[in-house]
Amino acid sequence: MLQETISLTPLGQPLIAGFVVVSAVLYLLYNTQQWRPNNLPLLNDGGPFDFLQVTAVNRFRRDARRLIKSGFDSYKNVFAMRTDVGVELFASPEYADQFRNHPSLKVFPFTAKMHHGHLPGFELCRSQPVEDRILIESVRTQLAQSLGKLIQPLASDIGEAISDRWPSESGWQEIVLGSVVERTIAQGTSSVYCLDEAWPEFVVKMEMALGMASAALSAWPVMLRRIVAKFLPECLELYRIMKSGRELMSRDMRRRTALQASTGEEPLNFFEWFKEASHGEEYDELILNLRIAFASMHGLCDHLVKILLRLSEDPQLVSDLRKEVIQVYETHGWSKTALYHLKLMDSAFKEVQRVDPILFVGRVAVADVTLKDGLIIQKGQSIRISGHTMWDEDKYPDAAHFDPYRFYRLRQAPGQENTAQFTSPTSDHLGFGYGGRACPGRFFAAAVLKISLCHVLMKYDIKPANGETGQHVWEFAAAINANMTAKVLVRRRQPEIQI
């Protein structure tokens, strides 16, 4: 009836014709802009009848690991694939050495492309050259130089956060592990980001809202996202939360300024480190602080939840780690030296990262790039380096098995002491990236993770809820994320030592 009504009105024919023309233009624009780089084989293409490639995108979001594996099984080194951000290149780990320090292959533009950093509300994922430089320098230089001074305050703050956020009742208590860990990390690390008491809840809401908005928007064709973002409820909620974050952090900046003026103490926070790293260049300090906080929160929570779920199923590993914590703490207290000597814990974190990596190493070309084998990466093209050598039997015997002692043993082999450490990226282990653009905050992350796990091990027993095991991760598109909704049972225990 509606079709008949439209066709019988004076404007009916033009409306129908206009709809057909607009649809055709959208179809042609979308399919012509998704070029096939280097005439490489294109996987997961929806074909001419998959309008705006919606079916192909949803297939990638649902079944990316199988699609990527089939690509490397068939084409070995490099291929193109239609994903939820357009057509991307997927390259084998053999390309890692060419990527590691290439000046035209950038990390932040890749993050911005993945998470819509060019759109309002998504600013904490944006890439802006001055801000990118300040962020890297502040982490690589100022944070790294201050890390020794941060260990004791972090240990105290994380211990307090665990007391506040984890159950204090006797007997076994069921918790949603991801929710508790998020709030623990947000509160325990707040001193370097924001001292406002509302910060922990804000940063948890921000991370959740960003994830939901990014996923919801990624379901739409790339060319429509700028328009759709203005109406999607998830995007509007993210925009609202970001606005409240600006207000919260402005309030915190005023408080910090007054506190520093009255005490004269050396500030150990990103607001001050950004100033030092800026060298007088202008930047948005609120957005920059949110960017670093989001990147840190996501990685820290992911790693800690993954290892705690593994520990809940392995009482022997828990016992061995507790012995190590007691021995190291009684000798070194809270210090960088102590964290270095937690070698079994270091190995367990690195093995979690090997078995369940958080994502591929991704780059975007900011200029045309030609690699040694003639592969051309066009400006604006995104490319991901696969980490599948981390599951390679030739590199890691019994690779499918989670062996928390693997890298502990490797560190005892000649020449392996450094490369087998959690914070040491290699072409065979891309958990923190690789080369000069490997995660600059990995030393801070390792410190927070080890301190947090020490507190949990000493203060709590942990086991699976309802006997459920093996549910450590959930996969979405190309990411292998911690199962943040997993439930465990925890019980307060009397620690052998007070830390």
From Swiss-Prot:
Gene Ontology molecular-function annotations: heme binding; iron ion binding; monooxygenase activity; oxidoreductase activity, acting on paired donors, with incorporation or reduction of molecular oxygen
Keywords per UniProt: Glycoprotein, Heme, Iron, Membrane, Metal-binding, Monooxygenase, Oxidoreductase, Transmembrane, Transmembrane helix
Cofactor(s) needed by this chain: heme
Annotated glycan sites: 483
Main location: membrane
UniProt membrane topology term: Single-pass membrane protein
Transmembrane residue ranges: 10-30
Disruption phenotype: Impairs the synthesis of austinol and dehydroaustinol and accumulates the intermediate compound isoaustinone.
A GO cellular-component term linked to this record: membrane
Tree of life domain: Eukaryota
Biological processes annotated in GO: austinol biosynthetic process; dehydroaustinol biosynthetic process; terpenoid biosynthetic process
EC number: 1.-.-.-
Alphabetized InterPro entries for the sequence: Cyt_P450, Cyt_P450_CS, Cyt_P450_E_grp-IV, Cyt_P450_sf
Pathway noted in the entry: Secondary metabolite biosynthesis; terpenoid biosynthesis
Residue numbers binding heme: 439
Enzyme class: oxidoreductase
Cellular compartment(s): Membrane
Family: Belongs to the cytochrome P450 family.
Function: Cytochrome P450 monooxygenase; part of the gene cluster B that mediates the biosynthesis of austinol and dehydroaustinol, two fungal meroterpenoids. The first step of the pathway is the synthesis of 3,5-dimethylorsellinic acid by the polyketide synthase ausA. 3,5-dimethylorsellinic acid is then prenylated by the polyprenyl transferase ausN. Further epoxidation by the FAD-dependent monooxygenase ausM and cyclization by the probable terpene cyclase ausL lead to the formation of protoaustinoid A.
Other remarks on this protein: In A.calidoustus, the austinoid gene cluster lies on a contiguous DNA region, while clusters from E.nidulans and P.brasilianum are split in their respective genomes. Genetic rearrangements provoked variability among the clusters and E.nidulans produces the least number of austionoid derivatives with the end products austinol and dehydroaustinol, while P.brasilianum can produce until acetoxydehydroaustin, and A.calidoustus produces the highest number of identified derivatives.
UniProt-recorded name of the protein: Cytochrome P450 monooxygenase ausI
Organism: Emericella nidulans (strain FGSC A4 / ATCC 38163 / CBS 112.46 / NRRL 194 / M139) (Aspergillus nidulans)
